[in-house]
């Protein structure tokens, strides 16, 4: 395995909104992150992953981006972000950001132009389809519930969204759209960003026929994930993305990718893979209840240990996988791993120590 600059680095996710507020408005900000760089460095952190700080209506906590080139004023200014990059560099630290390019906000200028002219250039940046006999074009359920197709007011057309209706999916089959995305990514990398955590990226390839599927719920809908599982061609899009952006800058990338078979791992995280690494959700999914993370079933330690061990064994000769304990999508890990009576400061420290030891044995490779 070829040695790269990020192999011996420790990464830390910051959710800026709740990290540190320095101006008293109740929202964490870039100044707060800058003020804690020395502390983070002392902890041994090398790479800081920032959850979205782009301009956004915040329907989905910033994962609905209305301007890819602007910092949300709630967090600060572009000048402050550039200061963060410079101060991190002084400490031999690296900044990566969330990259949300499966979809954007319905407030983004592209989508607003598409709505204004459904037959125009920008309509092809998204997926617009006519309904069928007064119904949506197909019976797909979005990840957030409800139909993936949202009616366009005053029209017989619908637009497609796999997440919230305020997050229309971008049409990756359109080369003009891809050029816009690549230009934006390179703009950030040229500023000194070290890379990206790439959100929901496996969803960018669609079956353009959008065929109906057998319902898998009482609502008569079928999970949109089943389309993603069955469609082919995502590798070509991911390789094009890498070659036009990340590969040219030696950027560190973490793909949010689900359900990849062992035979596909080299394509995703091999020496010439699409990404530097991907998240491994196998242990994480053990606590996925019928209604998501908030009704998680009891976790068997043996099953959890086996899931992590198996995931690391399958990639040891291929590349790196990042096991997940918790992230921004669900409750804190301590709420899942500890019973209510044990959720105190001492137990929190002990489980953090356990995680560190466990990570060293089972997660760190090479």
Spans of features found by a protein language model:
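Active-site and adjacent substrate-binding regions of carbohydrate-active enzymes
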Residues: 1-366
């Amino acid at each position: 395995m070829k040695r790269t600059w990020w192999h011996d680095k420790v990464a830390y996710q910051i959710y800026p909104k709740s990290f540190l507020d320095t101006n008293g408005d109740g929202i964490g900000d870039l100044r707060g992150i800058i003020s804690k760089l020395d502390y983070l460095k002392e902890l041994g952190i090398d790479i800081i992953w920032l959850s979205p700080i782009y301009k956004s209506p915040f329907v989905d906590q910033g994962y609905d981006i209305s301007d890819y080139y602007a910092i949300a004023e709630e967090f600060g200014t572009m000048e402050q972000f550039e200061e963060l990059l410079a101060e991190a560099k002084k400490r031999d630290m690296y900044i990566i950001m969330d990259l949300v390019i499966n979809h954007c906000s319905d407030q983004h200028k592209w989508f607003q132009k598409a709505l204004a002219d459904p037959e125009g250039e920008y309509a092809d940046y998204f997926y617009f389809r006519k309904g069928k006999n007064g119904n949506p074009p197909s019976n797909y359920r979005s990840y957030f519930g409800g139909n993936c197709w949202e009616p366009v007011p005053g029209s017989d057309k619908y637009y497609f969204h796999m997440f919230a209706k305020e997050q229309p999916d971008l049409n990756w089959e359109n080369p003009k759209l891809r050029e816009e995305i690549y230009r934006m990514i390179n703009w950030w990398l040229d500023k000194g960003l070290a890379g990206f955590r790439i959100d929901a990226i496996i969803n960018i390839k669609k079956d353009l026929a959008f065929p109906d599927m057998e319902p898998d719920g009482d609502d008569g809908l079928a999970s949109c994930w089943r389309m993603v599982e069955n469609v082919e061609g995502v590798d070509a899009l991911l390789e094009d993305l890498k070659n036009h952006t990340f590969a040219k800058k030696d950027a560190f990338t973490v793909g949010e990718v689900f359900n990849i078979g062992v035979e596909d791992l080299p394509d995703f995280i091999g020496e010439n893979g699409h990404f530097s690494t991907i998240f491994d959700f196998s242990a994480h999914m053990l606590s996925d209840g019928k209604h998501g993370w908030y009704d998680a079933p009891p976790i068997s330690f043996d099953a959890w240990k086996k899931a992590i061990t198996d995931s690391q064994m399958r990639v040891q000769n291929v590349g790196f996988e990042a096991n997940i304990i918790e992230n921004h999508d669900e409750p804190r890990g301590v709420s899942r791993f500890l019973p209510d009576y044990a959720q105190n400061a001492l137990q929190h420290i002990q489980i953090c120590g356990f995680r560190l030891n466990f990570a060293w044995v089972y997660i760190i490779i090479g």
